[in-house]
A protein has these predicted regions:
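Fe-S-dependent hydro-lyases/dehydratases of central metabolism
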Residues: 1-301
Length: 301
């Protein structure tokens, strides 16, 4: 089919609305929002859909936070995620090197303002969440849907009727965790800040803000990997590299790095890594590696 027609047959995706209103609690980021939603809908909850995120909590996010959220939509099976452009969007693309300039920008702006969702638009599926209900999240298992509040405990293998949850059981065995075990205080061996999910300048700024004046634990190996050369240069221009160096960290060259165990950036078998990446599958960061997905803020703490 592809060789004969130069086309890939695709079905038109369904549309889904995820509306989140209210104000997010302190230290709750777009990554936490993504993990929370996936934990509620499951890793297959968005299968066959294109997801639109909306609501006051979404509008209050920075562009980089919105990118993180849309990036993670694939982790619940969606084809992709989008957010209606607004003034935050327009300001973000006003000054970059390759953005339209002057009259071209104004002409483009008029077109961008037309990219809106009709007030009476219909969706195949709709979900509504309160921002105030979303806590700081972390995964404990082997897919992004196995996420819980960082203050919570690992789920029980058996439900109230005594039936064994095979997915929970398998995840606990691989992760070396037990039912009822607290996630707060869980030992980690590695920390990874980076990936297409959380390797932006805003992520580095947040991480540096928290670790400034502190010292990295000598028992933790940390990889701080900017998402691009542009992010690396911006971090150096802002002095973020100096803050990290004084705290015992260092900026590495941009790339995928430990997100998928690229090159030498591998987590050894049986070791735990808190990671800002988007996937925590078995062996994702190296054979036998154990991954906790979290935000840059949580990773810094």
């Amino acid at each position: 089919m592809v060789l004969a027609s130069q086309c890939v047959l695709q079905r038109k995706p369904k549309n889904m609305k995820i509306e989140i209103n209210g104000q997010l609690p302190k230290n709750v980021t777009a990554k936490d929002v993504a993990l929370y939603v996936i934990s509620k809908l499951g890793t297959g909850g968005g299968t066959g859909h294109f997801v639109e995120f909306c609501g006051s909590a979404i509008r209050s996010m920075s562009m980089e936070g919105r990118m993180t959220l849309c990036n993670m939509s694939i982790e619940m099976g969606a084809r992709g995620g989008l957010i209606q452009p607004d003034e935050t969007t327009f300001e973000y693309v006003r000054d970059p090197k390759f953005a339209p300039k002057e009259e071209d920008y104004n002409n483009s702006l008029e077109k961008w303002k037309m990219l809106t969702t009709d007030p009476d638009a219909e969706f195949h599926d709709e979900y509504f969440f309160k921002a105030e209900d979303i806590p700081v999240m972390i995964t404990w298992g082997t897919n992004p849907g196995l996420a819980i509040p960082v203050t919570a405990n690992v789920p029980e293998v058996k439900d109230e009727n005594g039936a064994v949850d095979v997915e929970v059981q398998a995840a606990q065995e691989y992760m070396g965790l037990t039912s009822g075990q607290a996630m707060a205080g869980q030992k980690i061996d590695y920390a990874f800040l980076g990936s297409c999910t959380n390797g932006r300048i805003e992520d580095l700024r947040e991480f540096a803000r928290i670790v400034e004046g502190k010292q990295k634990s000598p028992d933790v190996i940390a990889w701080i990997v900017p998402g691009s050369q542009q992010v690396l240069k911006q971090a150096q221009a802002e002095g973020i590299d100096q803050i990290l160096e004084k705290a015992g960290f260092g900026l590495r060259e941009p790339g995928c790095s430990a997100c998928l165990a690229m090159n030498e950036d591998k987590v050894p078998e049986g070791k735990y890594c808190i990671s800002t990446s988007n996937r925590n599958f078995e062996g994702r960061q190296g054979p036998g590696s154990r991954t906790f997905l979290a935000s840059p803020v949580s990773t810094a703490y």
